[in-house]
Regions:
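Ankyrin repeat A-helix N-terminal signature
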Residues: 40-45, 75-81, 108-114, 141-147, ...
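Ankyrin-repeat-protein effector appendages
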Residues: 2, 26-40, 157, 167-170, ...
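Ankyrin repeat structural motif
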Residues: 47-54, 81-89, 114-123, 147-155, ...
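Start-of-repeat signature of ankyrin repeats
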Residues: 34, 68-69, 102, 135, ...
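Ankyrin repeat boundary/linker residues
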Residues: 65-66, 99, 132, 165-166
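Alpha-helical adaptor scaffolds
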Residues: 70, 77-86, 90-91, 97-125, ...
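Bacterial N-terminal signal peptides
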Residues: 11-22
Length: 207
């Protein structure tokens, strides 16, 4: 009898607690759904939906994909979409956010020799010497891909050619010496950057 009375007393309290927990979780759930919907809009090039989502919650611009960990900025960089890149930057997209492998939008641009995109990212203070999980910088990736125009741009913006990776303990300069028989990349690396090296510690929207 005592147990039955006790249960009758506790049950309503338990229901209230569960309800309160669900209520507390709902904002986080709503943000997750909103972020995923925003990334889908970016992937589908739906400027209207993306803009509306950011009007509701401006922080969604830096949402990371639940599986890949990449942001909208990485998505549009990989498809070499300068219009969307400028739009996202104007909305406060953070170019330093990396995916699960530590790859940043600037690194994607370096691999693709997407110079226009890299320039936009660097103008937005993308860390030029940030490393991925292998310890590779954007400059190392550009040298490995033999993307001369990208090497020139990164060096111009103060990239450190002597920063070694974790995998082989080699720097961009080392890779250039080993792999570039023409000497072109090494010459670009030895060129002086414009101005002081970067501190690493009205825009049109998409149509």
């Amino acid at each position: 009898m005592f147990r039955r009375v006790k249960f009758r007393f506790i049950a309503p309290l338990l229901a209230v607690a569960i309800g309160a927990g669900a209520f507390a979780a709902s904002p986080a759930l709503a943000q997750f759904r909103g972020g995923f919907a925003f990334l889908q809009a970016v992937e589908n090039r739906d400027g209207t939906k993306a803009t509306d989502a950011l009007k509701d919650d401006a922080t969604l611009v830096n949402t990371r994909h639940p599986d890949r960990g990449e942001t909208a900025l990485a998505i549009v960089t990989k498809r070499r979409d300068t219009s969307w890149l400028r739009f996202l930057i104007s909305k406060g997209a953070d170019p330093s956010i990396a995916d699960r492998q530590g790859v940043t939008p600037l690194m994607h641009a370096a691999l693709l020799n997407y110079v226009d995109g890299a320039q936009e990212l660097l103008d937005d203070k993308a860390p030029v010497d940030q490393v991925n999980r292998r310890g590779e910088t954007a400059l190392i990736l550009a040298v490995q891909a033999k993307n001369a125009a990208m090497v020139r741009l990164l060096v111009k913006n103060g990239a450190n050619a002597d920063k070694a990776d974790h995998i082989a303990g080699m720097s961009a300069r080392d890779y250039a010496k080993r792999d570039d028989r023409t000497g072109q990349l090494l010459a670009l690396i030895d060129a002086k950057p414009d101005g002081v090296p970067r501190d690493n510690s009205a825009v049109f929207g998409p149509k």
